[in-house]
Every structure is written in structure tokens, then in C-alpha cells.
């Protein structure tokens, strides 16, 4: 082993790393480890400084932005293999000193993980130790995580078709609905409880989410007094255990001259909801069902319990508390109604991260799967078998409802672009094993003519990596329309739909190529600039196809000046009636229906405005 003195040279480590790539990983790690042992006279500060300088030097070399990004990853990997504890400091300092990103982004992305803030530097170091910077992994990372410094790499031409039997003739047709025998399913999503919501705090803040103790507007020249004659809803109100609304004492929010816009009792459009707004939304569901003598067979919740605040204000304790409080409130309000849930990208700590079970880092996240599974089983939403599976498989599960529908819940952090662990071995089709689980469940259901709903958080058309999206489309094509009866998402906070077509490219988006549709639910959180909303579906009892959706909302701005009274929740629209599409009454609102709607939205200003209104 060569012993170096003086300045620690990263190029030598990088050379060792490249050589080690030709041999088994352990040989490379041992070589690098031996090298560091031979330089034991060097302090951590010396090593850190040398790596920082090496990263900084890349900008002065005759290299493309892409090559610089790839080389940064390679340099980082050489350090992560032997001293992962130094990676966060090296990259945070480099990022701040060079102005690569904003200070907040540098710190949240590269600083070491702690329970006090949702920083991801330790996860970044884990990723570096596993990934191949010179191949698809590095190209993918530099495109998605580094603002397209590299061109988007070509998606690997991989198939999972060897995991299912050939598609029989009958599987190309959807079963015929019963006609008028239906039941109702509630769909709620994206609560994002803001535990530190403060009445009277800044609702017009300069950065990120507002209405917190730390919310500020950088321009201090304004005053909230202009709202004094307009807004009057500043009461410390609550709901009693029996559900009774209690309007509490009035808070004089206009004493604080530094506030531009004081946060009202029920929330604001630039904030996540206080618990009282979440309870109001759940109460509105219960009250409507009583008023209309409407019964729900079950509910689906498509994720996100934790707020959208900056990661430096998001800690482990509040993540756990948010998950426990929201599920407790759902159980208290919906009582015995089964609720089938998914984990959102905010429902983990650190934010958005999830590691594969079999590569050394999954223990960081097992606590969360155990907590979720415990809550779901304690509230009798899952049986023991399903909850045990969820504990060991990233909160994913399958369960059969009383009417015979199978529901498959998936953890979408598996394909999330902000999950560092999704960027190593990224050319492999199923490093988490979740697609294998999904396929096995679909094959089993197809064999016994059982219909299936798939629920998850992040739609594949938004924030998903390309290879998982490709494989998902392949799976949906194989098992539609015979087995997959419905696909449901959250995440966007908007009332949307996602049509899946056979083939690829814009030329494939024809009515003949329609495979299925994904229902994307609006959110209870008003962040950002949305009215709190929820929906329910009427579902055919025979086929479990969605026959209609009914959408409800409250005009949050009306609560700013209603003297602290409860929000008024209103019916907004029926998906079948609103778009006035020629469509048989006995046919479900399937992908073909939504293709017709999409064509109208694309070609008609009137329909485009209608869609925007909803």
C-alpha cells in the first residue's frame, strides 16, 4: 500500500475506487480502508478540507456540467465507502461555499441526519456508497436531483412479463356492471396537519409554509391593521370529545405590528390546516352521510399526514405525533368505518426517504412501518395478517373487503424522485420487491376472477422515476381491464385524473389505446391556494368499477370573516353530470370516459375552464 504524506489527494482515492470497481465490492472497500489506515496521521479536518477543495476544483476544469456532476458523485463515493460520516460536512460546505444551491437547500440536502431536523445528508452518503456514478445511476441522479445537469438517460428496456402468465382472451374485456346495484366509498387525502399553527401568526410569509411561530415576511413595512375591519375570525376554538364545537376566547391579533396578514382560526391558503380544520372536514363527512342517509362501505386515505414546512422545522417527534393525531381523529370521527391507508412522501423521517430491506439501511425506517401497521391494526382497519405484512414490506399490504374486492396498498416512496435510495441500482426493475408483490397479488386475483383496487400516494405521471413508471404501465396494461377495477392517488392536492394508454408517445393517446384511469383526489389541506375538499364514489357492486364521484369543499376565505363560526361545507359537482359527456348511464366512469373528457378539455375553452374550476 502506498503511503502518502502532506496533502491528502482525492484523485488517488478516486483511482483506487475505479480500480476497485473491477473487483468484488469488499475488495474495493478493503483497499480503500487500508489506504485510509495508512494515512492515520491525517486528521478528519485535513481529509474534509482536501475533499472540499477537490470538489471545488472541478469548476475550473475543462468539463461539462454533466461530467462535473458525475465526478462529484464519484469523489463522494470514494469517501462514502470508507468514511461516510464525513460526507455530510464535505458536501454541505462545498455547496454553501460555491453557492451551488440556496443555503436552505444545501443544508437540508447534505447535512447529517438528526432527530431535530429532516436533513438527508446521511441518506445521501448511503446512496453514494451503493450507486454506480459512471452508469445509469449517476446520469439519473444528475438529471433529477441536480436540475438536469445531465441529459435524461434512456430508460432501460426492461420487462417484468416473465412474472405473469399469458393474457387469456377473456382478460381483454372488462366485466359488465350490474346496472344500478351500487355502494359508496369515501376518498380522503393529504391532511398535512400543522401542529404548530398559530392564530395571528404571519399568513403572508416570504418562504415556504406560513402560519407558524417562525413565519416571517421579509418586507416589514406593511401592517395587518388593514384587515382589522374585514377579518374577525381569531378565536381559540376547539371541538369537544363528543364533537360539539366550542368557540373559544377572541385573540387580539392586531397588536403585532410586524404581521402582514394574521392567520385566522380555521386556516389559510398558504398554510397547512390546524387540527380544528381537519376535524371540521371529518365532521362534514359524518353530517352529510346522516343528512342523506348515506352509508359508506369503507374509506381510502391516500397519504400525507405531516405538514409541508421547511425541512429544518420538521423533526422526528412531530412526524410521529402528526401520524398519531390524524389517524386518531379519523378513527374518532368515522368510528367503525374501515379505512385503508397508504404512506405519503411526507409520512416518513427524514422526508421522502425509504431504503431497500436487504441492503443495510432499512432499519432507519422500520419504526415507521411498525407504527403505521400498529395504528391500522389497533383501529381495526387491518387484520393481523395484513398488518404483519405491512410491518415488513414498507407499509404495503393487500386485504379483501366484505364485498369481495381486493385492495392493494403500495408505498410510492419506492419510485419517488426525492428518495435517495431510489437512485442506486436504478437500472434494475424491482430493488424494493414491491412490483413482485403487486404482480403476485394480481395474478392470484385474476385466477379467481376477483377485481382489485390499487391505492398509493404519488401518481406515476408526477414525481415518479421513469423505469418504475414504465413497469407500472406494463403491469396495468397486462391486468386491465379485467382485474384492475380502480387506481387511486393523492399527492398533488388537486382534483385530477391520470389516463393510462397502451404504447408510448403522444401518438398512442387514442381512445382505442385507453387502458385504465387513475383517480387523483383533492386535499383537505388548503396549501397552497386550494379550498379544503373531499369526495366519495358510487361503486358497482358486481364489478367494483366507479360509477360516479361526488366532490365537496368549503370556501376557506369565508371563514376569515365569519366571527369564528364553523366552515360551511358544500357539494361541488358530480363527475358524471358536470362534463355533459354522452355516456351510457349504466357504464362506469372508466378510462374511455375520461379520455372523452380530456379531448373536450383540450379542444374547448369552455371545458378547459370547467376543469380548472373543479
Residue ranges and their predicted role:
Residues 4-22:
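Cleavable N-terminal signal peptides of Sec/SRP-targeted secreted and luminal proteins
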Residues 23-111, 116-291, 298-301, 362-409, ...:
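Metal-dependent phosphoesterase/phosphodiesterase active-site architecture
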Residues 187-189, 265, 297-304, 335-345, ...:
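Active-site neighborhood of phospho(di)ester-bond hydrolases with catalytic His/Asp-centered motifs
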Residues 195, 307-310, 341-352, 416-418, ...:
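Active-site environment of divalent metal-dependent phosphoester hydrolases
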Residues 254, 263-264, 270-361:
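Core catalytic region of metal-dependent phosphoesterases/phosphodiesterases
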Residues 319-333, 361-382, 477, 481:
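Acidic, His- and aromatic-enriched active-site or binding-groove loops in soluble protein domains
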Residues 416-436, 443-489, 499:
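Active-site-proximal segments of metal-dependent phosphoesterases and phosphodiesterases across multiple
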